[in-house]
């Protein structure tokens, strides 16, 4: 595996889930794969779970790890072509990327959407330059439009809490619900969550106010429901997440906050109409905006198991990439 951005990059999700369970049972089983190999983690944006879980995964596999915070101690990097670099950016990605490739065997990149130019963001300009110019396998630690390590961890978590699914049992009903936020956030997490849930063939419903339609590339055949309470009826899993306007129906609104309706905050009344549903969120979460304290602290909250599974999803991905080197 030379790149990891989308569910299809893993191939069979059933096999990937089995591999995840194998690794969870013995996290150091494949430590030999990373001997004398180096992972470079490049951060253009902040991180807690991604930084810790990915570094731990690489260490589980016996790798050395270099962490580069682009905005803390490194030269400011220019990402656009054809510009006259007479501002505060001293180095271009086109030189920086192959230099990074000289010092490592794998590269993980975290670079959020700017939310000002939809075409630029959805072209995945930054991470695709790493893929093209680094000469190394590259995986997304959240890019402009996707967060596959999170979505894979979410899928692992859901599969662990639906033991009959896949063995002739009922498909779980999973609801991806928009929730309010004080800042404009990218669509990477909901995009990937919808994509991976479709690939796993769950009964997926996406609910949000009008104007927040996600890109059809990720939503696929999932049902879109603008009535949140109706969408939540009988849900086995409720995945809450804010996202800014994706600009699908009105490109001029891309990246904007169109709604601050607090009735979309997930509370006990929302969870009461579910099928004893489990609450999920990628974290970090704004309590009182996305979800109420009683819901996130309830026994049905899976936010910590999700976070723990980030180590497992990253280990599977890095293992696959190390195997591709041999």
Question: Would you name each region that the model predicts?
Answer:
Residues 217-294, 300-301:
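Rossmann-like adenosine-cofactor binding region
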Residues 33-39, 170-173, 276:
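Phosphate-coordination loops involved in phosphoryl transfer and adenosine-cofactor binding
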Residues 61, 133-134, 200, 220, ...:
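Short, structured coil segments at secondary-structure junctions
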Residues 1-52, 56:
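Positively charged, low-complexity intrinsically disordered leader regions
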Residues 297-326:
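C-terminal helix-to-coil terminal segments
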Residues 44-66, 159-241, 247:
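Glycine-rich phosphate/diphosphate-binding loop of Rossmann-like nucleotide-binding domains
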Residues 34-40, 47-159, 286:
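Phosphate/diphosphate ligand-binding glycine-rich loop within oxidoreductases
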């Amino acid at each position: 595996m030379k790149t990891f951005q989308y569910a299809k990059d893993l191939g069979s999700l059933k096999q990937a889930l089995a591999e995840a369970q194998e690794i969870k049972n013995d996290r150091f089983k494949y430590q030999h794969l990373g001997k004398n190999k180096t992972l470079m983690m490049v951060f253009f944006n902040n991180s807690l779970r991604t930084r810790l879980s990915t570094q731990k995964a690489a260490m589980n596999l016996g790798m050395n790890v270099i962490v580069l915070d682009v905005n803390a101690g490194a030269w400011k990097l220019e990402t656009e072509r054809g510009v006259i670099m007479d501002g505060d950016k001293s180095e271009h990605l086109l030189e920086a990327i192959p230099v990074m490739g000289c010092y490592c065997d794998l590269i993980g990149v975290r670079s959020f959407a700017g939310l000002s130019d939809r075409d630029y963001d959805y072209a995945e300009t930054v991470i695709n330059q790493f893929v093209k110019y680094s000469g190394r396998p590259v995986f997304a630690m959240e890019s402009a439009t996707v967060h596959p390590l999170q979505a894979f961890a979410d899928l692992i978590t859901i599969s662990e809490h639906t033991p009959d699914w896949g063995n002739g049992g009922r498909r779980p009903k999973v609801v991806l619900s928009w929730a309010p936020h004080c800042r404009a956030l990218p669509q990477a997490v909901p995009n990937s969550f919808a994509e991976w849930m479709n690939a796993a063939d769950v009964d997926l419903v996406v609910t949000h106010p009008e104007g927040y339609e996600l890109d059809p590339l990720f939503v696929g055949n999932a049902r879109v429901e603008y009535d949140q309470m109706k969408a939540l009826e009988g849900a086995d899993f409720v995945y809450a997440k804010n996202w800014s306007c994706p600009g699908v129906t009105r490109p001029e609104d891309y990246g904007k906050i169109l709604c601050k309706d607090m009735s979309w905050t997930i509370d006990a009344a929302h969870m009461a109409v579910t099928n004893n549903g489990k609450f999920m969120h990628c974290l970090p979460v704004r309590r009182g905006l996305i979800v109420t304290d009683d819901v996130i602290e309830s026994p049905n909250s899976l936010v910590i198991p999700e976070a723990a599974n980030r180590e497992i999803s990253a280990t599977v991905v890095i293992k696959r990439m190390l195997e591709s080197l041999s």
